[in-house]
């Protein structure tokens, strides 16, 4: 209150100085509610209003039962597979499976001697550790394609490009000139 007997208004800064603790909080809350009403909003009453009324109309809640239900927890693998299918990522995921899980797709023995290097437009490039393994993989090409199709689906890998190890190079340094051609290097 001020000295001349007037009541302080809601915007009066002197009234706030006189109030303390919970009185100040109540006054501030009342001002905020009044401002909300002035803007045409419903200020609400928070927890003082009591619990929200229960829904009477609509479907009653029922338990799942012993059989499978859409509300049952789903395996993470199934959820990610469905997400990839919805977003159109299935092709990219299949390509990543071929390159990332090569040993599981083709088997441990083949994976020990051959490495996938690239997958472009259905052509899988595979580098073998020796020319003998490259020849063996070329012979087994149809079986490899069948294993890959069984693991990731048909159409992901349509053909294989199998290469042996890179041949040795005797070039040294960044610049070179054409030499005399291939010679009998080894004797």
Curated annotation (Swiss-Prot):
Residues 14-30 have a biased composition (Basic and acidic residues). It holds the Pfam family DciA. Residues 1-77, 166-187 are annotated as: Disordered. Residues 31-55 have a biased composition (Low complexity). InterPro entries: DciA-like, UPF0232_actinobac. Belongs to the UPF0232 family. PANTHER family: UPF0232 PROTEIN SCO3875. This is UPF0232 protein MMAR_0004. It comes from Mycobacterium marinum (strain ATCC BAA-535 / M).
